[in-house]
């Protein structure tokens, strides 16, 4: 049986190639290695911390080992625990196996569990508080109603009972007092999505509280966004793919991966788009993992029609309206980076007059009301102009427009870096912005109109 496990995909390039075959078709051991590598790479667990598991259709539990370096895990390290308790594999399974078993026993609908100790969520567990998942519309839909489980010794029977009790109540995401977080779902990627999204909410809330009082969405506002339908579009079959389109798909994927690695995106949040010379445009697909997006996943929109067999981002109509309204705009990026989103969920005003680069790239950043990007597409598109290439949508996202794909991405980076600097400055002293006279000098020197 374990001969299969030794046909290992032991480096990131190989894992990426396997992922392209569809995550759900990967062997459980490969899935566990890929997601654990991802969690460790982004500083969300330590060498010895955290454990993941998958329960397959036969009832076997595939689980990460105890005491093995999480930064260099291979599929050969993964244990398989049979329903009768037999353990297959070269290592001792995670000491947290008891609570994984308890959760699977009490919740037969769950097939995967993620447990780790990201610093942000550990901070909430120390304060015995739950991150506010109502700051942005999608978080509650992904994480569900988050619970808090009482503390006990790691690996103990009592800790397993404490956690299982919360899952028995119907929660899929549980913070453990003075410990970390546990997320369960019907597959490993969905469990990871909940884990990643809750961590994002925690980072957002911490940043927002440095600027003011975070503003939560009501259930009605969240429902308004969750009811948003995909834009109705006829399909077309692409007979010819130009070199320009091929290059655009390649470049989009390259920058999307960078955006994810820089934590400007999460696995399923974030939209890139790029206008082509024939008037059509490319856009990211709906609900596909941004970290491993491939050129063939990108969706082309032409004359209001969608490339057949694909589902575009729900922002496709907004992007189309922006391109139609502004011929000078050739790329639109929609993202939710936590630092700039801290401004979106508070009444704090973002002022780009911090350093010259910020003002040159961002100029006059404006904000628009929540849901306006869905309910008032024309008004949102008209809000852009040469001096306003960035919009902050309350409690939802930022929309960045550029003359090119790289130009828009550069603006997004500068926006988030500037927001981080402003938030960090709150602990240092009063911010002194560039003066109006100095702004005028910048405008003259860089020919800004």
Give, region by region, the residue ranges found by the protein language model.
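Glycine-rich flexible loops
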Residues: 19-449
């Amino acid at each position: 049986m374990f001969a299969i496990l030794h046909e290992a995909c032991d480096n990131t390039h190989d894992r990426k190639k396997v992922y392209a075959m569809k995550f759900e078709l990967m062997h459980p051991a490969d899935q566990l290695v890929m997601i654990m590598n991802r969690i460790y790479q982004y500083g969300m667990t330590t060498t010895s911390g955290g454990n993941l598991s998958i329960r397959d259709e036969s009832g076997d539990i595939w689980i990460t080992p105890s005491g093995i370096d999480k930064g260099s895990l291979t599929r050969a390290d993964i244990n398989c625990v049979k329903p009768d308790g037999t353990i297959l594999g070269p290592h001792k399974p995670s000491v947290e196996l008891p609570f994984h078993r308890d959760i699977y026993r009490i919740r037969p609908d769950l097939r995967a569990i993620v447990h780790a100790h990201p610093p942000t969520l550990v901070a909430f567990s120390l304060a015995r508080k739950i991150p506010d998942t109502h700051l942005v519309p999608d978080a509650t839909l992904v994480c569900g109603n988050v619970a808090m489980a009482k503390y006990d010794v790691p690996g103990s029977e009592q800790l397993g009972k404490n956690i299982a009790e919360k899952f028995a109540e119907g929660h899929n995401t549980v913070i453990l007092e003075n410990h970390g977080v546990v997320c369960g779902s019907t597959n490993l990627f969905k469990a990871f999505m909940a884990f990643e999204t809750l961590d994002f909410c925690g980072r957002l809330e911490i940043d927002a509280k440095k600027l003011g009082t975070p503003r939560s969405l009501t259930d009605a506002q969240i429902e308004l966004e969750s009811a948003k339908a995909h834009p109705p579009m006829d399909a077309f079959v692409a007979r010819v793919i130009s070199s320009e389109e091929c290059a655009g798909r390649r470049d989009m994927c390259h920058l999307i991966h960078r955006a994810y690695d820089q934590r400007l995106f999460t696995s399923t949040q974030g939209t890139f788009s790029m206008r082509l010379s024939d008037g059509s445009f490319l856009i990211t697909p709906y609900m596909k993992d941004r970290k491993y997006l491939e050129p063939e996943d990108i969706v082309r929109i032409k004359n209001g029609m969608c490339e057949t067999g694909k589902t575009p981002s729900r922002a496709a109509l907004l992007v189309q309206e922006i391109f139609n309204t502004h011929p000078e705009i050739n790329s639109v990026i929609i993202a939710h980076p936590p630092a700039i989103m801290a401004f979106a969920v508070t009444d704090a005003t973002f002022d780009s007059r911090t350093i010259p680069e910020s003002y040159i790239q961002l100029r006059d950043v404006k904000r628009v009301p929540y849901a306006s990007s869905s309910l008032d597409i024309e008004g949102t598109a008209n809000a852009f102009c040469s001096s306003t290439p960035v919009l902050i949508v309350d409690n939802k996202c930022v929309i960045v427009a550029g003359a090119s794909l790289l130009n828009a991405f550069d603006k997004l980076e500068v926006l988030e870096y500037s927001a981080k600097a402003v938030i960090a400055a709150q602990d240092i002293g009063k911010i002194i912005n560039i003066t109006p006279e100095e702004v005028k000098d910048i405008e003259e020197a860089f020919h800004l109109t």
